[in-house]
Regions:
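Residues that define the loop-to-transmembrane-helix transition and helix capping
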Residues: 37-38, 70-71, 113, 179, ...
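Short helix-capping/hinge motifs at transmembrane helix termini and TM-loop junctions
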Residues: 54-63, 138-146, 175-177, 199-204, ...
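Hydrophobic alpha-helical transmembrane segments of multi-pass membrane transport proteins
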Residues: 49-54, 69-141, 187
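Short amphipathic alpha-helical coupling elements at transmembrane boundaries
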Residues: 24, 28-32, 100-107, 176, ...
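Membrane-interfacial helix-loop-helix junctions in multi-pass membrane proteins
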Residues: 64, 144, 193-254
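Aromatic- and glycine-rich beta-strand/loop motifs that create alpha-glucan
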Residues: 2-46
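Junction motif at the cytosolic side of a transmembrane helix
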Residues: 2-8, 229-235, 245-270
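Alpha-helical transmembrane segments and their short interhelical loops
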Residues: 112-192, 236-249, 253-260
Length: 270
C-alpha cells in the first residue's frame, strides 16, 4: 500500500504577501498626503518660505568667513525638511492604532515588522515632494544647483529619509499614544535645528553645546547633504561624506532594529 503524502501547507506569511502588504501601507500614506491639501501645501510652501525669508535675512545681516549663507541654509533646510518629515510621519502609526484603521491592519495576517516597514517606506516617499520643492525654490532664488549636484543629492536624500523614519520609529515605539508624541516631538526636533547647523555654522560652539551637537542625529544628515551639494572640501562641510554615510547607515540599522523590536513587543502586549 503506497504511502499518502500530505501536501505541504502554504504559509500565510509568505515573503510575497509581506512585500505586497508593506507596499499597500506605503501607498496608503502617499494617498493620504495627496488627499490632504493643507498638509500638502504647508509641507511644500513652508520650507521654501523658510529659505527665502530666513535665508535672505541671515545672508543680509550676518557674515561667516568662507561661507555663502544662502546656499548654506538651502542645503541645511533640504536635509532638515526631508529628515523631519520622514520622522514626524511615523506618528501616524499611533493614529492608526487609535482609529478604525487599526482594526483592519493590526489584526491582518501580516507581521508587525511588515507594518512598520510599510510606514517607514511610505513616510520616506512622502518626504520627497518637499525636497523637490526646496530645490526648485532654490533655483528661483538664484542658488547654484547643477545637474551633477542633483544627481549627488538624490541618493543622499534617500538615505536621510530612511534615517529620519528610523529615528521616528524608535521614538514612536517608546510612546503610548499620539498625544504623547505630539507633546514630545517638538522638544526633540527644535533644539536639533540649531545644534545640527541647519541654519547656522556650528564649528565654534561652546564645548558643552558641541557635545550635544554630536549626539543630535540631524547633524549628520545636514552635513551629508552639504557634502553632496558642495562636492569638494569646503568650510561648510564638517566631516567627510564617506564618514557620514557610514555613520548614518550604522545608526539607521541600530535605531530600526531597536524600534522594530520595541514596536513588536508593545503590540504583542496590547
Amino acid at each position: 500500500m503506497s504511502a499518502v503524502i500530505a501536501p505541504r501547507p502554504t504559509s500565510r506569511f509568505s515573503l510575497r504577501n509581506e512585500l505586497a502588504a508593506a507596499g499597500a501601507i506605503a501607498a496608503r500614506d502617499v494617498t493620504k498626503l495627496l488627499r490632504d491639501p493643507i498638509r500638502l501645501v504647508g509641507g511644500l510652501v513652508f520650507p521654501a518660505l523658510f529659505i527665502g525669508v530666513l535665508g535672505g535675512a541671515f545672508a543680509s545681516n550676518f557674515e561667516s568667513p568662507g561661507i555663502d549663507l544662502l546656499p548654506f541654509i538651502f542645503a541645511g533646510q533640504l536635509a532638515q525638511g526631508v529628515w523631519q518629515s520622514a520622522a514626524l510621519g511615523l506618528i501616524s502609526i499611533l493614529e492608526d492604532r487609535e482609529n478604525d484603521f487599526s482594526q483592519e491592519i493590526f489584526v491582518a495576517p501580516i507581521g508587525r515588522r511588515t507594518i512598520l516597514a510599510g510606514k517607514i517606506l511610505g513616510e520616506s516617499l512622502v518626504a520627497f515632494p518637499q525636497a523637490f520643492t526646496v530645490m526648485l525654490f532654490g533655483i528661483v532664488l538664484g542658488i547654484p544647483l547643477t545637474a551633477a549636484q542633483v544627481v549627488a543629492l538624490i541618493p543622499a536624500l534617500v538615505l536621510i529619509a530612511i534615517f529620519g523614519a528610523s529615528f521616528g520609529a524608535l521614538v514612536v515605539s517608546l510612546l503610548p499614544n499620539q498625544r504623547s508624541a505630539n507633546l514630545l516631538f517638538p522638544f526633540i526636533f527644535l533644539p536639533q535645528f540649531f545644534l545640527a547647523g541647519a541654519f547656522n555654522p556650528i564649528r565654534d560652539l561652546p564645548w558643552y553645546l558641541d557635545i550635544v551637537s554630536h549626539i543630535a542625529p540631524l547633524r549628520y544628515a545636514v552635513d551629508l547633504i552639504r557634502g553632496a551639494y558642495y562636492g569638494v572640501p569646503n568650510v561648510a562641510v564638517l566631516s567627510d561624506p564617506i564618514w557620514n554615510v557610514s555613520l548614518i547607515s550604522i545608526l539607521t540599522v541600530v535605531m530600526l532594529s531597536i524600534g522594530t523590536l520595541l514596536f513588536v513587543r508593545s503590540e504583542r502586549n496590547r
